[in-house]
């Protein structure tokens, strides 16, 4: 039986149609899978921020239920960030060497387990230990998430959306921890345990998304996968001591004059400096192959010098931005609750616009980053945060909320909303493929240090003014101390804006072209979009 040409043409058309349908379905599945990957990484950011803000909310109730003295209460809040900050660099290196999915899944599972374990704590010692162990999960999740986003989203538009969504997870998590966590603490029978149940659920959801959506890790392009254990000890111990001093300096017996505080600060800084010199030595020996016994550096110092040193500037801008953002939030809360005397829920309502606009700034950034020069975004974000600090630095307690408090809450998150996402997009473009998670680790370390450093420095300034405080009237030194703290916050934001203006002068739109990085030198080859004209 013969086949006519007409039947053959029909068969060809049918096959072509089927192939087209299969390709369309595959493309749709790819889009859905990529969206779920982005959601999983954003969830990691949400879990991180929710955990930080929720702990601050539950501290008063926790202290009452577990009979924790106020002098030891600070350890509950600082134990987690202390451990997280110490192990971010280590996990960044592990992610780049051995893949990102496994650390992401491990971190999510670890976070869920030890967050749930916190609800069984019976005293401050067990709470401190569990909080520290919980911080290890966060240290694994965050660098892995940055590397996963860089691996998954290759096109400029997709990467832009992915990192702005990742950045938006921070204000969303802060809102969940503060608003929902505060409501759960006050309205549920489980009180302080309820926010930890919420975080456990979010961690499990992150784990499920990670297992399902994230692709298996591709093999590392680095042949030598040895870990620099000396460098790991130097940076982990150094950061541990520095963050410890920043969190405990104000509560020590003689505050910053306490001998062990001074000694630990000196030793911590010395170890961090020694780490950088050791990494530089290893990088030189390893690159020239003059010492086969040398392992690859834990973190290449040349990473900081990419794009003519602008990578280092970006890291320091992130540090200063977080100094400003979190010290503003800290002192705004204390102003409302301690100075004005508002209940916690009313304080949350007054700060609610900050959480909303924190998300909106990331949405706005998605539309602007491919059109507006990079330097303008970095400068304007921190400038708006500086204006928010200025409003609280000159605030009149008798004025209505809409005169000072509301515009400050609207403007304050601009620094974090613009600078964080811009920094991540910029740094992942100038870093090599096998350095993506390390970039995320360094950025997260800077945010951890910035949070502690900003609050610590502004507290020192606050304390220098507050001893003369006599009452809470408008022109009293008590008000002056809160204003002085916000002037310090303004200085951080202004320094960040100034550094961005100097470092990125002439830099064009980040996402107009694709950045190409020379693997030998690490310098930009096509740098019109990143390093200026």
Model-predicted segments: where are they?
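Transmembrane-helix exit segments and adjacent C-terminal regions of multi-pass membrane proteins
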Residues: 2-4, 25-28, 32, 36-37, ...
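Central cavity-lining transmembrane alpha-helices of secondary-active solute carriers
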Residues: 78-93, 138, 142-146, 352-365
